[in-house]
């Protein structure tokens, strides 16, 4: 665990929000069926987090990117990665969320969470970004804190026994 910087900049993401920051930043959020991806550049110690609610939409021409949608939140990442003079493959990713939180009118679980997770994995793979760890699925909420200075993500998941935990090594 790395010590926090003396001048810490804390950011809380609501659903649909995105933040990319410097090494003095801690980004936090609370997830259910939504998904957060963290990207971290280990050499430059910069990174960001998105918090998307749905996979995608039919985006109107000339519409601004909307972080509520995973495909567009990832485009925001790519813009910031390029603006930092870096390439996507230089980053490490972590993926969180995608719980089964919602039921449809018939009482059947909706698959919003699993679809959000699948999209996150696809976007990372398509951009050659290493997925270091993921904590996905289950049925509970997750609280995340991403320390950009170290790349560490702290996770609180009270109903954690039924979630899938994977890392790059098995």
Curated annotation (Swiss-Prot):
GO molecular function, one term: protein-glutamine glutaminase activity
Keywords, comma-separated and alphabetical: Chemotaxis, Hydrolase
Cysteine pairings via disulfide bonds: none
Annotated TM spans: none
Alphabetical list of Gene3D superfamilies matching this protein: 3.30.1330.200
UniProt KW ATP-binding keyword: no
SUPFAM superfamilies: CNF1/YfiH-like putative cysteine hydrolases (SSF64438)
UniProt lineage: Bacteria, Pseudomonadati, Pseudomonadota, Betaproteobacteria, Rhodocyclales
Protein name stated in the entry: Probable chemoreceptor glutamine deamidase CheD 3
Pfam families with a match to the protein in the record: CheD (PF03975)
Reactions catalysed: L-glutaminyl-[protein] + H2O = L-glutamyl-[protein] + NH4(+)
InterPro entries the record matches: CheD-like_sf, Chemorcpt_Glu_NH3ase_CheD, Cytotoxic_necrot_fac-like_cat
Superkingdom of this protein's organism: Bacteria
Family to which this protein belongs: Belongs to the CheD family.
Protein task: Probably deamidates glutamine residues to glutamate on methyl-accepting chemotaxis receptors (MCPs), playing an important role in chemotaxis.
GO biological process: chemotaxis
EC number: 3.5.1.44
